[in-house]
Regions:
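Short glycine-enriched loops at secondary-structure junctions
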Residues: 1-2, 151
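Short beta-strand->alpha-helix junction loop in the catalytic core
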Residues: 55-57, 152
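Short, conserved catalytic or interaction motifs in soluble domains
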Residues: 5, 56, 122
Length: 193
C-alpha cells in the first residue's frame, strides 16, 4: 500500500509513489514514526511491509476480507464471487507462516537493520483470475465469476522485491504460493462448512 501509484515491479523499498488510500497513508506514517524513534530515542523498530497475507483462520467476512478466504467461502457455498476489475491485476500472495518467520527474524535482527522498512512477501506474482480458477479446480467447482468495477484506491499489480529482508533479516520464505494455497484450501474445506 505504501507503494501507491508507482508502476514499477518488483516493489522495492525506497521507491514509492503517491499513496492511494487512507490506510496506505497510515502505513507510511507508521514507518516514519519508527525511523524517528530509532533516530531520537534509540528504539529498534522494523517496518514490515506484508504483501497480501493469506492462510488458515482468516475471516472471510466483512468489507475488508482478503480475497482468498472470501473466494473460498463463496465457492464452498456454490456461489459466484465478484472479481473487482478484469481479473488481470496481480498480487504477491504471502502465506502466514512466512510472515511469522519474518516477524521472528526481525525480533532477532541486528540493530544496524533497525529503523528500516522491509518487504515481506514470497517474491512471486499471481493474477487474480488465475487464483480464482485454481481455487475452482482444487474444489472441483465450475462456477464462473462475476466481474465488477475496479475498487478505488486499489493498485493494479504488486510483487515484492524481498532482497533487503533476505540480506538484513535473513528472511527466506519457506512457503511459495503453491504450497501455501494447498494448506489454506485444506483448512477452509475442513472449517467452512
Amino acid at each position: 500500500s505504501v507503494y501507491g501509484d508507482h508502476p514499477g515491479l518488483p516493489k522495492k523499498e525506497g521507491i514509492e509513489g503517491h499513496v492511494l488510500s487512507p490506510y496506505a497513508l497510515t502505513k507510511k506514517t507508521d514507518e516514519e514514526f519508527g525511523r524517528l524513534y530509532k533516530t531520537l530515542y534509540g528504539l529498534d523498530t522494523y517496518g514490515m511491509r506484508y504483501f497480501n497475507v493469506f492462510g488458515r483462520r482468516q475471516n472471510p467476512e466483512g468489507m475488508y476480507a482478503a480475497v482468498i478466504p472470501k473466494f473460498l467461502k463463496l465457492l464452498l457455498k456454490d456461489e459466484a464471487p465478484t472479481i473487482n476489475g478484469d481479473g488481470r491485476q496481480s498480487r504477491d500472495f504471502t502465506y502466514i507462516d512466512n510472515v511469522i518467520e519474518a516477524n521472528l527474524k526481525a525480533c532477532l535482527a541486528p540493530s544496524e537493520a533497525a529503523g528500516e522498512a522491509f518487504n515481506i512477501g514470497s517474491g512471486g506474482r499471481v493474477y487474480l483470475i488465475d487464483l480464482y480458477y485454481e481455487l475452482c479446480e482444487a474444489l472441483g467447482k465450475k462456477i464462473e465469476p462475476v466481474f465488477g468495477p475496479a475498487r478505488k484506491g486499489d493498485i493494479r499489480d504488486s510483487n515484492a522485491d524481498i532482497s533487503k529482508a533476505r540480506e538484513l533479516l535473513d528472511y527466506d520464505p519457506d512457503y511459495d504460493f503453491e504450497k501455501g494455497i494447498r494448506l489454506a484450501i485444506d483448512w477452509y474445506k475442513e472449517n467452512l462448512k
